[in-house]
Amino acid sequence: MIIKPRVRGFICVTTHPVGCEANVKEQIDYVTSHGPIANGPKKVLVIGASTGYGLAARISAAFGSGADTLGVFFERAGSETKPGTAGWYNSAAFEKFAAEKGLYARSINGDAFSDKVKQVTIDTIKQDLGKVDLVVYSLAAPRRTHPKTGETISSTLKPVGKAVTFRGLDTDKEVIREVSLEPATQEEIDGTVAVMGGEDWQMWIDALDEAGVLADGAKTTAFTYLGEQITHDIYWNGSIGEAKKDLDKKVLSIRDKLAAHGGDARVSVLKAVVTQASSAIPMMPLYLSLLFKVMKEQGTHEGCIEQVYGLLKDSLYGATPHVDEEGRLRADYKELDPQVQGKVVAMWDKVTNENLYEMTDFAGYKTEFLRLFGFEIAGVDYDADVNPDVKIPGIIDTTV
């Protein structure tokens, strides 16, 4: 079939398998052209491995460090008449390119929050890898079925303690509008912490440790975003921020556990990028459109692969890691440069419907958004007939 982008709200409901493969290849080429990661990981588990930062971590480990990788994700395959999810196609492409390099790459499809998927992962590590020396935790999910209670909990994107009104960008209608959000209830805050906080990361590490599949010196990292003043009301000081603060608490006990075997655990702070998760946050499209404009002008613009490859090379496995006073690894320092933030803040209230494309890089934002789904990739013929039914050989599918 011929597949064109169809966008509804902050999701593109179509995906392009050939475009997704080309996007993965671009990221692999970036890593191989920037050289190996010295003393990098060799056997890696990535939880949330199919898109965005998790996919970038899998690519960086495999093609920057020659690592065997096991990826966990929750995606949907395509059929002859309907495209699958972008994450499915990304993972199929990743495994294809890894196999060409002689690297082990296997994937588990299912609910990473569940005990079942944790057990299947442990069994697969024992059978195929023995032990892992890096665990990357990169889940972004709107809800979680708690494995101990069976309760399904939802996360909420709301301010805490006060109602907030801020400028947003309606990406469908391409207009600036005021957005008002009521404060989260305590139940909504607790739910967001349960879904997006550190409990599941801790459950994963506990399960892996008890099963004896963590190598001596094993490291783990979970990805987070902090942002600057302009996003704080809705992000760091909001319900999501409460979940991110929970990561900072949970990492301490995880670090103690791994330190007993010479290992380490860190929260890694990454810059704002276009992802399916960030497009759902009302102020992020406007913030990102302004940020892209400023950072591209300064020559410091980065996407997922540049961020994560740099994180592994410079901080997780580097001699002089960027660490803040909380012990987090920082890869977001170019975004938080006072000059960059100052320019974004200065332009924030000046953007109008009329000057949107001049004042901001909304065009770049839209391109990045479509690239998530395999569109707007250079060299891909979008008028060609493609088969949406792409197989992942050897996938362990716990959803069937």
Swiss-Prot record:
Domain of life: Bacteria
Site (Plays an important role in discriminating NADH against NADPH): E75
Enzymatic reactions: a 2,3-saturated acyl-[ACP] + NAD(+) = a (2E)-enoyl-[ACP] + NADH + H(+)
Keywords associated with the record: Fatty acid biosynthesis, Fatty acid metabolism, Lipid biosynthesis, Lipid metabolism, NAD, Oxidoreductase
Role, per record: Involved in the final reduction of the elongation cycle of fatty acid synthesis (FAS II). Catalyzes the reduction of a carbon-carbon double bond in an enoyl moiety that is covalently linked to an acyl carrier protein (ACP).
GO molecular function, one term: trans-2-enoyl-CoA reductase (NADH) activity
Enzyme class: oxidoreductase
BP terms from Gene Ontology: fatty acid biosynthetic process
Coiled coil feature spans: none
InterPro entries membership: Eno_Rdtase_FAD-bd_dom (IPR024906), Enoyl-CoA_Rdtase_cat_dom (IPR024910), FabV-like_NADH_b (IPR050048), Trans-2-enoyl-CoA_reductase (IPR010758)
Keyword hit for Lipoprotein: no
Name of this chain's protein: Enoyl-[acyl-carrier-protein] reductase [NADH]
Pathway: Lipid metabolism; fatty acid biosynthesis
Active-site residues (renumbered): Y235 (proton donor)
EC numbers, comma separated: 1.3.1.9
Binding locations of substrate: Y225
Protein family per UniProt: Belongs to the TER reductase family.
Subunit structure comment from the entry: Monomer.
Binding site for NAD(+): 48-53, 74-75, 111-112, 139-140, 244, 273-275
Gene: fabV
